[in-house]
Amino acid sequence: MGQKVNPVGLRVGVIRDWESRWFAEKDYATLLHEDIKIREYITARLKDSSVSKVEIERAANRVNVTIHTAKPGMVIGKGGTEVEALRKALNQLTGKRVHINILEVKKADLDAKLVAENIARQLENRVSFRRAQKQVIQRAMRAGAKGIKTQVSGRLGGADIARAESYSEGTVPLHTLRADIDYATAEADTTYGKLGVKVWIYRGEVLPSKKKASEEGGK
C-alpha cells in the first residue's frame, strides 16, 4: 500500500522554509528540546487564540519567536499585557532573552492547522463529523483554495469499530513539489475516545523562477 509522506516536510527547502532557523554544533539536542518546550507552552497557553504556527530564530543568547495567529488582538491583550506576560514566562522557561513578534493569518480558512483545529472543536461539541468536514471544505473553496481534502478517523458517531472517512473537493497534487500544499493534524477528545483529524489544502502553485526574478529586480 502506498504511504503518504508529510507534504510540508517534503517541500521544506524547495518552496517552504524551516520553522526553526538556527545553527548549533554541540548544543543541538538541548536547543531542539527547548524549541519543543517553547512550542508546547505557547500552544497550551494560547489554545483559544487560533495559533497556526510558531517560528523560532536564535542569535547568541537571544531567541526570536514569531507567532502566526488569526486572532492577534487576543494574543497581544489590552495594552500589550498578554504578550508581555508571555514574554516573561518564556524568559523564565528558557533562561534567555526572548523577543516575540506577532503576525496575523489573513485567511484562516486557507490555513490547514486552523481548519483542522476547527473540525476538532466541532467534533468535541458533538457536531456530526460529516457536517463539520463539508462545512470547512465549502469555506476553504470560497476563500480561494484550489483544492482541499479532510479526513476524520476513530470511533465515528460512537461506533464500536474505528474507521476513517474523508471528503475532498478540487485537486490536491501531493506529488507536485511546486504545489503549495498546507497539511496539519489535530485531535478531538470525545466521550467515545480520541478522533484524529487531517487536513490538506492546495493553495496554488509557487513558481520559484518568478520569485527569484522579482527578488533580483528589486535589488
From Swiss-Prot:
Which NCBIfam families does the UniProt record give?
A: rpsC_bact
Family from the record: Belongs to the universal ribosomal protein uS3 family.
Functionally, this protein is described as follows:
Binds the lower part of the 30S subunit head. Binds mRNA in the 70S ribosome, positioning it for translation.
Concerning InterPro entries, the annotation shows: KH_dom, KH_dom-like_a/b, KH_dom_type_2, KH_sf_prok-type, Ribosomal_S3_C_sf, Ribosomal_uS3_bac-typ, Ribosomal_uS3_C, Ribosomal_uS3_CS
Q: Which Gene3D superfamilies match?
A: 3.30.300.20, Ribosomal protein S3, C-terminal domain (3.30.1140.32)
Q: Which GO terms describe its biological process?
A: translation
Arranged from A to Z, the UniProt key words for this protein are: Ribonucleoprotein, Ribosomal protein, RNA-binding, rRNA-binding
* Any one GO CC term of the record: cytosolic small ribosomal subunit
Please report the name of this protein according to its UniProt entry.
Answer: Small ribosomal subunit protein uS3
Which CDD domains does the UniProt entry name for this protein? Answer: KH-II_30S_S3
Q: Which residues form the KH type-2 domain?
A: 38-106
Pfam hit, one: Ribosomal_S3_C
Q: Name one GO molecular function term.
A: structural constituent of ribosome
Q: Which residues cross the membrane?
A: none
On subunit structure and binding partners, the annotation says:
Part of the 30S ribosomal subunit. Forms a tight complex with proteins S10 and S14.
